[in-house]
């Protein structure tokens, strides 16, 4: 029996999970610097273990809260041991990317994995069936592609992807439709190419999709995938259990 606190500090928000016996019990979203809000959230509880991870500079107040509310705690850093072998410069690997691949490997061991995290950027991570992180690629995300076409051209309008149907014409009949079709078909083709490369490998394989745009992207790509929206949190919990 274990009751763990997982604090994942992003660039603009903080995600907090209560994990009981390796299952996520609840998830809370806190604003940027989560200090006081985090203190109120965890005050009624006493945790067995806790982990704090940040994609940027750590919040010292949040770190202190995490340390104080659990019997044992871990501050995620570039030297933190993980249950994978890495073929990547650890100093340049974001904590969220690393946690995602650890989470995927814990869910699907002995499997060739492609982990796709679809947020502001889209990351493609490869994990071998032997538990080796083979590396990854970073590409512009869905919203970023639309925004770049608007910002770096003279007259192209900004398209809001939130209202776009998954059924996109092959070719647009207006500038708006042309932008939409170009971005969506281009991104779908990019993702399908990575998936095809994975499935060309021998043995069991799986594609794991996570991130804010995961549900939409799942509808526009032709290949079978598994959606795990809380993959980073699961990975951080696995790293915590591995170390403490």
Swiss-Prot record:
It is found in: Cytoplasm. The keyword Lipid biosynthesis does not apply. K(+) binds at residue 117. InterPro entries: ATPase_NBD (IPR043129), Type_III_PanK (IPR004619). The active site is at 96 (proton acceptor). ATP binds at residues 8-15, 120. Keywords: ATP-binding, Coenzyme A biosynthesis, Cytoplasm, Kinase, Metal-binding, Nucleotide-binding, Potassium, Transferase. GO terms for biological process: coenzyme A biosynthetic process. The keyword Glycoprotein does not apply. Pathway: Cofactor biosynthesis; coenzyme A biosynthesis; CoA from (R)-pantothenate: step 1/5. Its EC number is 2.7.1.33. SUPFAM superfamilies: Actin-like ATPase domain. Substrate binds at residues 88, 94-97, 175. A monovalent cation. Ammonium or potassium. One of its GO terms (molecular function) is pantothenate kinase activity. Its cofactor is NH4(+); K(+). HAMAP family: Pantothen_kinase_3. Catalyzes the phosphorylation of pantothenate (Pan), the first step in CoA biosynthesis. NCBIfam families: baf, PRK13320.1-3. Belongs to the type III pantothenate kinase family. This is Type III pantothenate kinase. It comes from Porphyromonas gingivalis (strain ATCC BAA-308 / W83). The lineage of its organism: Bacteria, Pseudomonadati, Bacteroidota, Bacteroidia, Bacteroidales.
């Amino acid at each position: 029996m274990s009751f763990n606190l997982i604090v994942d500090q992003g660039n603009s928000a903080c995600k907090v999970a209560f994990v009981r016996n390796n299952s996520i019990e609840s998830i809370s979203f806190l604003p940027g610097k989560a200090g006081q809000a985090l203190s109120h959230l965890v005050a009624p509880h006493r945790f067995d273990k806790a982990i704090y991870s940040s994609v940027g500079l750590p919040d010292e107040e949040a770190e202190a809260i995490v340390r104080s509310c659990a019997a044992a705690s871990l501050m995620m850093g570039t030297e933190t041991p993980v249950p994978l072998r890495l073929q990547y410069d650890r100093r340049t690997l974001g904590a969220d990317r690393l946690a995602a691949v650890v989470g995927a490997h814990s869910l699907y061991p002995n499997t060739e994995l492609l982990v796709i995290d679809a947020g502001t950027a889209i990351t493609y991570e490869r994990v071998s069936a032997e538990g080796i992180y083979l590396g990854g690629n970073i590409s512009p995300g869905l919203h970023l592609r639309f925004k770049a076409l608007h910002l770096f051209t003279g007259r192209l309008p900004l398209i809001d992807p939130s209202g776009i149907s998954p059924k996109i014409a092959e070719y647009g009949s207006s500038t708006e439709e042309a932008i939409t079709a170009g971005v969506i078909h281009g991104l779908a083709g990019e993702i399908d190419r990575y998936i095809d490369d994975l499935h060309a490998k021998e043995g069991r394989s799986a594609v794991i999709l996570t991130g804010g745009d995961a549900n939409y992207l799942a509808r526009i790509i032709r290949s079978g995938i598994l959606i795990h929206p809380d993959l980073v949190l699961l990975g951080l919990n696995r790293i915590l259990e591995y170390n403490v």
